[in-house]
């Protein structure tokens, strides 16, 4: 039997706890070695302890003092953008070659969207999983980009307010900045813009995303087919990811886009929804589910490469 690589999860909140459950249920090459938090009374640490996972409420410093740290090859950071910079530096002081999956908007490593550029980043020591909105929408921008030149990409991510914990709320500015940049760097748009909406509806609604691209005129059927194939690729690790309706197309003439200028061409509108797998969080928290699923997929592919020298299918 192939040995599993041990991973530590930093951040015992919603994302960290959901990730722990996912790894326990679905990890093929990864297993949970430790859960790290800063609140000794957190539900995530208590749950990890009940499940037999080593815990510490003393942050990364506490992790380095755990006996299991010697065996840790992967770290998932589910804290905040500001904390991640400190965490990565401290981890590398003890283990320069440790693999860090950054689930915050810090982006000190390359942006990673598994279905778009995951395989190009398998040797990176730190990868950034962008944001929940980025994981849901950048693949769609990329789907259009592989058919035609995208001059502008804009996304609106609407998430249930109840699914937004303190980390998400503290990182709203970083969310928009990181997602906008990923639309360009990974999605292939010349200019990107991201908007996040915290929907206060009760009962909570599942994550919904709208993607707009302005591109050169191209074969609409080819774009629709590319979008459908990309959606199926994302569904391979986020089963609740789906197109809400058919892709819509409009011709635009001399449209003024702030920061870009006047554009004529094809406007493509893509409507998505993401339902969570409800491993730990409610089904409406698809925004958190897509982050943990993408993070685990990336780590699994890295681990498979480390084990066999090839990328897992």
Swiss-Prot record:
<feature type="binding site">
    <location>
        <begin position="12"/>
        <end position="15"/>
    </location>
    <ligand>
        <name>NAD(+)</name>
    </ligand>
</feature>
<keyword id="KW-0058">Aromatic hydrocarbons catabolism</keyword>
<feature type="binding site">
    <location>
        <begin position="163"/>
        <end position="171"/>
    </location>
    <ligand>
        <name>NAD(+)</name>
    </ligand>
</feature>
<feature type="active site" description="Acyl-thioester intermediate">
    <location>
        <position position="132"/>
    </location>
</feature>
<dbReference type="Pfam" id="PF09290">
    <property type="entry name" value="AcetDehyd-dimer"/>
</dbReference>
<keyword id="KW-0560">Oxidoreductase</keyword>
<dbReference type="InterPro" id="IPR015426">
    <property type="entry name" value="Acetylaldehyde_DH_C"/>
</dbReference>
<dbReference type="InterPro" id="IPR000534">
    <property type="entry name" value="Semialdehyde_DH_NAD-bd"/>
</dbReference>
<dbReference type="InterPro" id="IPR036291">
    <property type="entry name" value="NAD(P)-bd_dom_sf"/>
</dbReference>
<dbReference type="GO" id="GO:0051287">
    <property type="term" value="F:NAD binding"/>
</dbReference>
<comment type="similarity">
    <text>Belongs to the acetaldehyde dehydrogenase family.</text>
</comment>
<feature type="binding site">
    <location>
        <position position="287"/>
    </location>
    <ligand>
        <name>NAD(+)</name>
    </ligand>
</feature>
<dbReference type="GO" id="GO:0009056">
    <property type="term" value="P:catabolic process"/>
</dbReference>
<dbReference type="InterPro" id="IPR003361">
    <property type="entry name" value="Acetaldehyde_dehydrogenase"/>
</dbReference>
<dbReference type="GO" id="GO:0008774">
    <property type="term" value="F:acetaldehyde dehydrogenase (acetylating) activity"/>
</dbReference>
<dbReference type="Pfam" id="PF01118">
    <property type="entry name" value="Semialdhyde_dh"/>
</dbReference>
<keyword id="KW-0520">NAD</keyword>
<protein>
    <recommendedName>
        <fullName>Acetaldehyde dehydrogenase 2</fullName>
        <ecNumber>1.2.1.10</ecNumber>
    </recommendedName>
</protein>
């Amino acid at each position: 039997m192939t040995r599993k690589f041990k991973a530590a999860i930093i951040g015992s909140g919603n994302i960290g706890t959901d990730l722990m459950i996912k790894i326990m249920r679905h990890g093929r090459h990864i297993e949970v070695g430790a859960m790290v938090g800063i609140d000794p009374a957190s539900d995530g640490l208590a749950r990890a302890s009940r499940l037999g996972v080593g815990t510490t409420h003393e942050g990364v410093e506490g992790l380095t003092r755990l006996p299991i740290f010697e065996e840790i090859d992967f770290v998932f950071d589910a804290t905040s953008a500001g904390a991640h910079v400190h965490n990565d530096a401290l981890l590398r002081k003890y283990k320069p070659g440790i693999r860090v999956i950054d689930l915050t908007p810090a982006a000190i490593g390359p942006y990673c969207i598994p279905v778009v550029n995951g395989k190009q980043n398998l040797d990176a020591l730190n990868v950034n999983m962008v944001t929940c909105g980025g994981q849901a929408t950048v693949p769609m921008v990329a789907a259009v980009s592989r058919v035609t030149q995208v001059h502008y990409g804009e996304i609106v991510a609407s998430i249930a307010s109840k699914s937004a914990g303190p980390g998400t709320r503290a990182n709203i500015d970083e969310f928009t900045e990181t997602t906008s940049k990923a639309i360009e760097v990974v999605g292939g748009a010349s200019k990107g813009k991201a908007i996040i909406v915290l929907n206060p509806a009760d009962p909570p609604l599942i994550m919904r995303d709208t993607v707009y691209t302005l591109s050169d005129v191209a074969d609409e059927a080819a774009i629709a087919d590319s979008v459908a194939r990309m959606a199926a690729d994302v569904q391979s690790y986020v089963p609740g990811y789906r197109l809400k309706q058919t892709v819509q197309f409009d011709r635009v003439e001399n449209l003024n886009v702030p920061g870009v200028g006047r554009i004529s061409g094809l406007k493509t509108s893509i409507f998505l929804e993401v339902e969570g797998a409800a491993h730990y969080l409610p089904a409406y928290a698809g925004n958190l589910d897509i982050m943990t699923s993408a993070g685990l997929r990336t780590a699994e592919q890295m681990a498979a490469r480390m084990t066999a020298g090839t990328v897992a299918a």
